[in-house]
Amino acid sequence: NAHPLIPPRLLQLRSVRFGILIAMLFFSVWSGFMFCMALTMQTGLGMAPWQSGNSFIALGVTYFISAWFAPRLIARYSTSTILLTGLAIQIAGLLALIATFRVWGMENTALTLAPATGLVGYGQALIVNSFYRIGMRDIQPDDAGAASAILSTLQQAALGLGPAIFGAILLHALQNHHGDYTQAVN
């Protein structure tokens, strides 16, 4: 009379496996990025917590705008196209963030970071909007609860692992660059 908590047949579905991959990679990188950015801004750039928080306003605003339009974009194009577009925009934002740190260094402010963090936020919302749609694509109604629980649990686990992994990478880079945050994040 044994019934597995997770029906094994769900793990055989390509969409669920891809959703698991997205959850583990994307959400761990995302939470690690947010942790390392906050640490860099407060400890490295000497920003007060409120200044560091204000540096993410552009990210939040563009995330909201992107999330508002994402369902219409997905309906018009496709979930996969919007996922890839979100990844491209987010990568562009991260590259812009690296360039911003190279140009402004220790003189960065919420204003100098806004264009890059705005791109990151816009891409982020497109990716998150695509995540559950892809992971749940092939799920039958009877399995919806278990499948969404798999994806949600892995999302939360990845969000917890990200700061530990990327925080360790940042601290190692700081040791190699003698505590210079500008060099460590580049």
Segments the model singles out, each with a brief description of its role:
Residues 3-176, 186:
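12-transmembrane solute porter fold
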